[in-house]
């Protein structure tokens, strides 16, 4: 039984389909790290991870310690990498829970080494290399090779992997992405020349997987990190138009009509006088608002699907509620409303909502609140 009259519906068959799409693209002997940060981009990290592991994922990737700990409580043996920054104060938690950490400096490695020695355990780490994102990482140069040698000499650490991140592989022209891979491959080869090897070497996110697996840029990679594509979205419109891989929508945002009321002509609906009734208006109230992830700016801008009919979202979206206009719509209290998701029901998908807000589907789905129950079908 639902605790609220609003929820996120997650299509598990589509999750499996999209993971299979990854497997069909990457080399047959490749390892796959399913990226499930931000509550699996809104799909629910525990259930999504369970499905990806069943389908053959070797690793899970998250952004922060709390996400990793949630997964560890359900998957005690699964390798989990924190792709984001881990403060030094988190070292003991990383070690005690057998979590892998991203490292980008000798100073941090030294602190983690000391903590590992105190606990008499080993901490697995992946070295981050900055090849052009200019966010975090060691530069791919001789100085960094010397730093890596020093990190390798530290006790208590197991350097399990090395990776970079592609910043623009979803662009129509792949020059920057290919230059990043050229720099990463050259650096890996320099390390190999000095007998420095790694169990895992990774660089390709969804954009890299969808667009760069046909060349030889990935010749030294053996681990792939799909993210947004697992949830049914292409990294960019350019990729959607040109990519032959079919991805299926996973996430739908739904709510029930909790009350229908007739509002006379000449009234304002909701906060701030943003919708004026120029006729007698049948208004449906939904228990869903911007605190749930339905952006406030969508008021008066989108249509939602009700019984395969389209109805406008009116007024400003409130923190916990919103309004739809039901004139000329066959609907009753308790009927389901699709805010975005299933195209077969005439609803917008998350990428179309994102376009209205000048953002991307990543933001539209990853900001869906945890207070919304996930319903798996």
UniProtKB/Swiss-Prot annotation:
Reactions catalysed according to its record: L-alanine = D-alanine
CDD domains xref list: PLPDE_III_AR
GO cellular component: cytosol
Binding-site positions, substrate: 135, 319
Gene Ontology MF, one: alanine racemase activity
Record has Hydrolase as a keyword: no
Record PROSITE patterns: ALANINE_RACEMASE (PS00395)
Residues bearing the modification N6-(pyridoxal phosphate)lysine: 37
Domain of life of the native organism: Bacteria
Active-site annotation: 37 (proton acceptor), 271 (proton acceptor)
Obligatory cofactor(s): pyridoxal 5'-phosphate
Keyword annotations of the record: Isomerase, Pyridoxal phosphate
Pathway connected to this protein: Amino-acid biosynthesis; D-alanine biosynthesis; D-alanine from L-alanine: step 1/1
Family: Belongs to the alanine racemase family.
Job of this protein: Catalyzes the interconversion of L-alanine and D-alanine. May also act on other amino acids.
Protein name: Alanine racemase
């Amino acid at each position: 039984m639902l605790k609220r009259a609003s929820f996120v519906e997650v299509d598990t068959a589509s999750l499996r389909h999209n993971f299979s799409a990854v497997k069909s693209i990457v080399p047959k002997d490749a390892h796959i790290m399913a990226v499930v940060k931000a509550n699996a981009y809104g799909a629910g990290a525990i259930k999504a991870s369970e499905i990806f592991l069943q389908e053959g994922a070797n690793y899970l990737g998250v952004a922060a310690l709390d996400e990793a700990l949630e997964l560890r409580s359900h998957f005690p043996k699964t390798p989990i990498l924190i792709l984001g920054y881990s403060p030094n104060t988190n070292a003991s938690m990383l070690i005690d829970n057998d979590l892998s950490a991203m490292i980008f400096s000798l100073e941090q490695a030294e602190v983690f080494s000391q903590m590992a020695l105190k606990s008499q355990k080993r901490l697995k780490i992946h070295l981050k290399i900055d090849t052009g994102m200019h966010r975090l990482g060691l530069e791919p140069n001789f100085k960094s090779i010397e730093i890596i040698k020093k990190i390798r000499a530290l006790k208590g650490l197991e350097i399990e992997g090395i990776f970079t991140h592609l910043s623009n592989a979803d662009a129509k022209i792949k020059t920057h992405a290919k230059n990043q891979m050229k720099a990463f491959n050259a650096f890996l080869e320099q390390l190999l020349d000095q007998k420095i090897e790694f169990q895992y070497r990774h660089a390709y996110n969804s954009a890299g997987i969808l667009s760069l697996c046909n060349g030889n840029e990935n010749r030294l990679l053996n681990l792939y990190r799909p993210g947004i594509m697992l949830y049914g979205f292409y990294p960019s419109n350019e990729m959607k138009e040109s990519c032959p891989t079919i991805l299926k929508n996973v996430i739908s945002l739904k709510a029930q009509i909790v009350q229908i009321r007739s509002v006379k002509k000449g009234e304002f609906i909701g906060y701030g006088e943003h919708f004026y009734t120029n006729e007698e208006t049948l208004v449906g109230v939904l228990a869903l608002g911007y605190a749930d992830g339905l952006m406030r700016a969508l008021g008066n801008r989108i249509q939602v699907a009700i019984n395969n009919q389209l109805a406008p979202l009116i007024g400003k979206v409130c923190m916990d509620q919103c309004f739809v206009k039901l004139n000329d719509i066959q609907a009753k209290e308790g009927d389901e409303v699709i805010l975005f998701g299933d195209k077969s029901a005439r609803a917008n998908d998350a990428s179309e909502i994102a376009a209205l807000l000048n953002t991307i589907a990543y933001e539209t789905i990853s900001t869906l609140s945890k207070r919304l129950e996930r319903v798996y079908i």
